[in-house]
């Protein structure tokens, strides 16, 4: 059984072995030919000739993660709609109605997120009720 598999996939095995050997050769040559300058300046990050200031670990707002999630959601939507558009003739009116329902549900979800303020990246304004009385 192993002999049958080996006969059928010998070209792929040679390709994998060649790719691994090529990677090992490139890593080995980089280690042999690369510079080895060590010093205090080598341990600092390079920022286009400007001395680095502050900590590199910055806190990101949760809004950035929300934008990333929206991107993934609508990217998957585009993937499904692309697959539908390729087979639109075979799916007929039933496929069109299903795609319209899918797009409608996504639009309802988008309108809901817009309505609750999930798409607003600016901070909310303070209410005018916090004023001091004169």
Swiss-Prot record:
Q: Report which residue ranges the record marks as coiled coil.
A: none
| Record's catalysed reaction(s) | a quinone + NADH + 5 H(+)(in) = a quinol + NAD(+) + 4 H(+)(out)
Lipid bilayer topology: Multi-pass membrane protein
What's its top-level EC category?
translocase
Keywords annotated in UniProt? Cell inner membrane, Cell membrane, Membrane, NAD, Quinone, Translocase, Transmembrane, Transmembrane helix, Transport, Ubiquinone
One GO term in the molecular function aspect is:
quinone binding
Stored InterPro entries? NAD(P)H_OxRDtase_bac/plastid, NADH_UbQ/plastoQ_OxRdtase_su3, NDAH_ubi_oxred_su3_sf
As for subcellular location, the record says: Cell inner membrane
Q: Which GO terms describe its cellular component?
A: NADH dehydrogenase complex; plasma membrane
Q: Which residues cross the membrane?
A: 12-32, 64-84, 93-113
What EC number(s) does the entry state?
A: 7.1.1.-
Describe the protein's quaternary organization and the partners it interacts with: NDH-1 is composed of 14 different subunits. Subunits NuoA, H, J, K, L, M, N constitute the membrane sector of the complex.
HAMAP family linked: NDH1_NuoA (MF_01394)
Any idea what this protein is called? NADH-quinone oxidoreductase subunit A
What is the species of this protein?
Aeromonas salmonicida (strain A449)
Instruction: Point out the gene that encodes the protein.
Output: nuoA
